[in-house]
Structures are given as C-alpha cells and as structure tokens.
A protein has these predicted regions:
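Alpha/beta catalytic barrel-like cores
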Residues: 1-127, 135, 234, 241-406
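Eukaryote-skewed repeat-based solenoidal scaffolds used as protein-protein interaction platforms
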Residues: 113-293
C-alpha cells in the first residue's frame, strides 16, 4: 500500500467511539477524510407548528433541527493528535442539514467554506481542504467555473495539500471540473503542492469489485492523461446497510470488497492509494426508532484467505410470559432473554469460527469480544458493536497491508 491508509470518517457517534479506542500508534498511520455530517436531531425538533414532521426537503432548509455545531466540534477535537487529515462536507442528503447546505454554498468562490476551513486551522488543527462542487441551481457554466477556481485559489495560497472527492460511480462528467482547474493544478504542483483525487465508489456490493475496478482503471488513465501523476485514492465500502442484504439471518461471511477493488486497480496503476469507510455503510440508520427491539449481532473482520467480514446474530429467546394490560384488556406477553445473554452467545460463536477468527493484538474491539464471551458484555447497544467492528476493521487493514506499527 502506497503511503497512509485513508479513512473516510462520517462523524457518527459509533465512529468517534471507534477512533477514540483505536491504539494511538495505529491512529498515527491513518489519514482521515473527515466528512462533517448533521449530528443528532435535537429533542422535539423537526416538526411544524402543528407538530407534523417536516419533509426531507423542509429539514434541509430549517436551521436548528440537528446538533451540527456540537458534532463538528467533537469530531474535529477527536482529530487533534492527527499529523494531518482532510476536511470535507457530506454529500449524502440524509446526513445533511440547513447549516451544512449554507456552509457549502458556492457564492463568492465558496467563501463560507474557505473561511470555515481557515478558521479551524487557526485553532491548531492540522487539516487540509477538500474542494466543494456545489453550484447554485441558476449558475451558468462561467459562474460554476469561476467559483470553483476562486475556491482553489484561496486554498492553494494557504495549504500544500488539496483534495477533490468525486462519487465516481455517479458523476461521469467530473473531468470537466479537473480540466477547468488544470492550469491552477499544474501551477500548484509545480510549486511543490500535492493534489489528491479521491475516487469515492461509496457502497460496492461484495462480488462486484471486478466490474468497478475495470471502469475505475479507465477513469484513472484519463485522469493521468490530462493531469499527469496526481495522487489518486481509491475509496469504497462493502459493508451493507443490513447484513441480510448479502447474507443469512443468523450467520454469514462476505469479502471485504474494497480491498479486492483496490488490488485489482493497482495491477494497472501501481501508484494508487487505498481508502475505505472503516466498515461503515454510507447510509446511517440513526433516525430509525426501534420499537420491537433488535437481534444481537457481533461482526468480525478477518485476514484469513484475504479480507472477509463475518457475523453471528441471534433472535432473542422466549423465557417466559407475563400478564399485561393494553387499553384496559389483559393480555399475555412473552418475556425475552436479556440482550446480554445473546451478546455473550454470539461473541462465543465469533471466537469459535476457525480459522477465520484471529486474536488482534492491542485491539480494543477484540478485547470487547473476548470480554463479552466471558460474560462481561460491554454494552447492549448496537452502536457499541458497530464501534467494535470498525476498530477491528482498521487494525486488520493495517495488518493486511503490512503497515501496522504494533
């Protein structure tokens, strides 16, 4: 793997917990791409005067619904000991908010964004900027390019590294942006600047890596032909929104497709860099209200026979019944086993899957699984176990590429 491991960090609580618990030596060899997102919805927010929930479109134009400021502050504070990281804004509508929409406005050369980035650097953060491409609906081509160039110019005067991230499977016209900036990019690089193009594949379904790799290799050839040997990051995730989208109800195993995608691209373009989402799916489930409980599940990322993720999951068992009163009527309700019983059970199954299970040294996530199997379940929250998976994933990726400092 060329240079550091680039980690897209989407600033959810589970991701911040994983990052805090990742060994500091491992954090030192990871380059985060911090994608600022909306944060949690504030209590009783997101409703109109009649108490009716706002539509998705209304949410994006209503300020004060989400705790955006608190989220970006805590996310950037978590990065304070990084040697450097890229700062970006979310492109996922479900993770955006009115504050993000305003911050990413293209007016006056993305003035609000450039000011925000420079202000954060004044606070001592070793951040590097990512170019935004978010033209107003009524912008013509000249205005589009003018604002993009002004943004690049502002950043090039204050930074030696600049990134451009594109949803490569969706935007087939992004080369227009790069060609529009070619004189500026060339001048920046001639003066010692480093320009990174992050090809974000977002979610790549396990088994589809080869198809994406062939297309991406062609895209990279086009980039090199126009801009020379700029620095390209191949970024993706293959962890599904729901494990049952790719596997069985209780147990399955699937390939870490982003590794396969990267290795296929590297066969023809040896200088590309690796990036992933730390096993996080691009779509977040934090606004789903769980009324019927959930099935305890623990995931493990293995380096056996390449990189794979496997999971064990259990439906809670009925251990008795009790009488309850519902709207004045007596009914019999099942009593289910405690979540901790099932987390202990699935942790034991995770550790018992030979030869895929391997002890990961100096890993908080691995320690949490061992503790749970022994009866000391750290948490019954699904968010906690997402953090466990993410911390193990990062550790195993570093080991897989031979750059684990531990």
């Amino acid at each position: 793997m060329d240079e550091n491991y680039f980690l897209l960090f989407k600033t959810a609580d589970a991701e911040k917990r994983a990052w805090r618990n990742l060994n500091s030596q491992r954090r030192s060899v990871v380059t985060p791409i911090v994608e600022l997102s909306r944060g949690k919805k504030k209590r009783n927010a997101g409703k109109d005067k009649a108490g009716k929930p706002l539509t998705a479109e209304q949410l994006l134009s209503t300020f004060g619904v989400y705790g955006f400021e608190r989220n970006w502050q805590s996310s950037l504070e978590a990065m304070r000991d990084c040697d450097w990281f890229f700062l970006d804004l979310t492109r996922e509508p479900s993770l955006s908010c009115a504050e993000i929409e305003a911050l990413g406005n293209s007016a006056n050369g993305y003035e609000k964004w450039t000011r925000f980035v420079f202000d954060r650097r004044k606070e001592g953060l070793k951040l590097k900027p990512t170019l935004l491409v978010n033209p107003a609906e009524d912008d013509d081509e000249a205005k589009y390019v003018s604002d993009l160039k002004a943004q690049f110019s502002a950043f090039s005067k204050g930074f030696k590294e600049i990134a451009y991230r594109v949803a490569v499977t969706e935007d087939d016209e992004f080369l227009f942006d790069l060609l529009s900036l070619k004189p500026e990019i060339d001048a920046f690089r001639n003066e010692g600047g480093r320009f990174f193009i992050i090809l974000d594949h977002e979610y790549v379904r396990p088994g589809n890596g080869l198809v994406h790799a062939k297309r991406t290799a062609q895209v990279i050839s086009s980039i090199y032909a126009e801009l020379g040997d700029v620095e390209v990051v191949v970024l993706a995730t293959s962890f599904p929104k729901s494990v049952t989208d790719v596997g069985d109800e209780e147990h399955d195993i699937f390939r870490v497709e982003e590794i396969y995608l990267y290795e296929e691209v590297k066969k023809t373009h040896t200088g590309v860099k690796y990036g992933d989402y730390g096993s996080i799916n691009p779509i977040r489930n934090d606004e789903i209200i769980i009324t019927q409980g959930w099935r305890p599940r623990i995931d493990f990322v293995s380096r056996h026979d390449g990189m794979h993720t496997y999971y064990f999951r259990e439906k809670r068992k009925v251990v008795g019944t009790k009488e309850v009163v519902v709207k004045g009527e007596k009914k019999t309700k099942n009593v289910l086993a405690p979540y901790s019983v099932h987390y202990q059970s699935v942790a034991t199954k995770v550790m018992g899957l030979a030869p895929y299970y391997q002890t990961v040294t100096a890993s908080w996530g691995n320690d949490e699984i061992i503790a749970a199997a022994g009866g000391a379940v750290g948490s019954n929250s699904p968010s906690h176990w997402i953090s466990v998976r993410m911390e193990i994933h990062i550790s195993q990726v570093l080991k897989y590429f031979g750059c684990d400092p531990i």
